[in-house]
């Protein structure tokens, strides 16, 4: 195409969602450009946790809308989002956390979400593999769970096309054209595409792209980790997602294995030697860093999870901060 009204740059879950919603609400002349393949940036390796309650009313409304949308689009475009709504359990070791979780439960009730406040014995009954000695309690959201990030992205992309948006893979944007502080277009594979608006949905590349256009985007990638164990016998398929904010960990069932992730307070900056994300970092991973992950793994193994005699594969991922 030689021209369009809107160019969405980036074919992850955010870019495909933007393309779908723009087209859905009347912006029919929408093009999405992905430099490689859809999901190849950071979407493909996301843990895919799905929750309804957010830190604020607007975020809670967005999360509820998103989950309802995925269910609706699955029927409309006949593509799976990989939803597994087995519930999500947030647990507390400390009194402050316990009070916070109970406030979240009150908020959930205000939005008519199904929520259960559990004591430590009820938690043990619900999830036997949790060691509950030091727990004060937790809240269970039966409507939460997980989804397939790649499946959700493809679902949104298919829905966007159905609304008239056009999606092009293997189409790296080489330059954003600006004149008199106004967007004029983009250069893709040596070809100019005129446009009036650009939506930047480029994840960890956003800061570098912004710098080229004189826009400061305060975003920097950091290494992020999760572990996937070898298969565990008799691991329940309907195991809820468990979040332990005090230990900065979460875990969920993953094809008969256990996926254990962390949300560390201080992450390791990625690409700190070059201070630049490589252009060709598609479906990329980092080398193992057991030294960084081990303290979290030990805390979980001996505090909340029985030590399973399984060999764990460390998978190094990205977290945008």
Predicted regions and their residues:
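Conserved small/polar residues in nucleotide/adenosyl-binding loops
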Residues: 303-310
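Central beta-strand plus flanking loop segment that forms part of the substrate or channel wall
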Residues: 47-52, 88-90, 213-237, 295
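Glycine-rich FAD pyrophosphate-binding loop
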Residues: 25-42
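Short hydrophobic core segments
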Residues: 9, 193-203
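Helical element adjacent to the flavin cofactor pocket in flavoenzyme catalytic cores
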Residues: 143-189
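Dinucleotide-binding Rossmann-like beta1-alpha1 core, especially the glycine-rich loop
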Residues: 47-126, 248-251, 255-259, 284, ...
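Core beta-strand elements of the Rossmann-like FAD/NAD(P) dinucleotide-binding domain
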Residues: 2-4, 189-197
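Helix-loop-beta segment of a Rossmann-like dinucleotide-binding subdomain
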Residues: 3, 79-90, 104, 124-163, ...
